[in-house]
A protein has these predicted regions:
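WD40 beta-propeller repeat fold
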Residues: 1-181, 187, 191-208, 215-217, ...
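Hydrophobic pocket-lining "lid/loop/helix" segments that shape and contact the acyl-thioester
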Residues: 229-231
């Protein structure tokens, strides 16, 4: 099934890297972007608003380096953080002009992922090409925890939606790891899963069955892992319960639906975004069918990096692409 384009907007001169809906306002969307495809030059944070007929830019904030990711605050409806190519993290208040409210510089390489804790709303996590994951709180000028998570680039770090102290990470080393942030030393993972034979670029926790984690890889697959199948004593290779095939090139992002336990979306370098049904993880279905592709959005003309489900309107997705376009669409 092809997608239905609902609204679109352009971000001229900037490649879209990440997008996120506000957890407070149904009609507000933020985009992290970079000039020159993120290779050199500045970045821009775009705040977009949508109504029944249009998607328009409300405000923009410029940064000195590319912006690769963002996360809305869970405690302040007008604030969000961005991660940059120079290793900096900035906290912005969209009711103010130009300058960030707070800035941190501890990472020594690109910050590629930011995730605000949905349960402990005072903190957020960052992951970087410097192999580290850091946890922050806006009230402090330095990080409150540093985890040497992998021996190579950490593409994503995301908090569990059911445990404030549990974090998952994925890396160019092909592994998916989980961490208990209460445990010392923080260099020891709770679980280590051999997720893919290639780099793992993205992960997401299922919001309804939180023992399931989806990963997306350079190997063109999305894999779904059941953490209950993993043991704490060794590298696990038997946690994968489903592999989703269909993308033609590397998959940049994966996200479970916030409204349907058995649906997830993915996007990547084949210029498409896809929605999948994974009915076997929905316990109410007595005779689940195999996982299946249920829709494709193929209207972008460049790599699709940003992907977000609407938190208020079931089935509505946003994508941000290197074609300098933001699309809102549904199946």
């Amino acid at each position: 099934m092809n997608s239905k384009l609902q609204r679109q907007s352009s971000i001229p001169g900037f490649a879209g890297y990440s997008c996120a809906y506000s957890p407070f306002y149904p009609n507000r969307l933020a985009i992290a972007s970079a000039a020159n495809f993120g290779l050199v030059g500045n970045g821009r944070l775009h705040i977009l608003t949508t109504d029944a007929h249009s998607l328009s830019t409300e405000k923009t904030f410029d940064s000195q380096d590319a912006l690769y990711d963002l996360a809305w605050s869970e405690i302040h409806e007008n604030q969000l953080v961005t991660g940059s190519g120079d290793g900096s993290i900035k906290l912005w208040d969209i009711m103010l002009n130009e300058l960030p409210v707070q800035s941190w510089l501890e990472h020594t390489r690109e910050v590629f992922c930011l995730d605000w804790n949905n349960l402990n709303k005072l903190c957020f996590a960052s992951s970087s090409w410097d192999h580290l994951v850091k946890i922050w709180t806006p009230s402090r000028s330095e990080s409150i925890m540093t985890i040497p998570a992998h021996d190579s680039c950490v593409y994503a770090a995301r908090f569990s939606p059911s445990s404030a102290d549990t974090l998952a990470t994925c890396s160019s080393d092909g592994t998916l790891k989980t961490w208990d942030t209460r445990t010392k030393p923080t260099s020891r993972a709770s679980l280590v899963i051999a997720a893919h034979p290639n780099e793992v670029l993205s992960l997401d926790w299922n919001k309804y069955a939180t023992h399931y984690v989806a990963t997306a890889s350079v190997d063109r697959t999305v894999k779904i892992h059941d953490l209950r199948h993993a043991t704490t004593t060794s590298l696990n290779s038997n946690a994968c319960v489903e592999t989703l095939l269909g993308h033609q090139y590397a998959i940049r992002n994966v996200a479970w639906s916030p409204h349907a336990a058995d649906q997830l979306a993915s996007c990547g370098y084949d210029m498409t975004a896809r929605v999948w049904a994974v009915p076997q993880i929905a316990p109410k279905l007595p005779h689940p069918h195999p996982a299946a592709l249920i829709g494709i959005h193929h209207l972008h003309k460049e790599f699709v990096f940003g992907l977000a489900w609407s938190l208020f309107q079931p089935g509505l997705l946003a994508t941000a692409s290197w074609d300098q376009q933001v699309h809102l669409w549904s199946l």
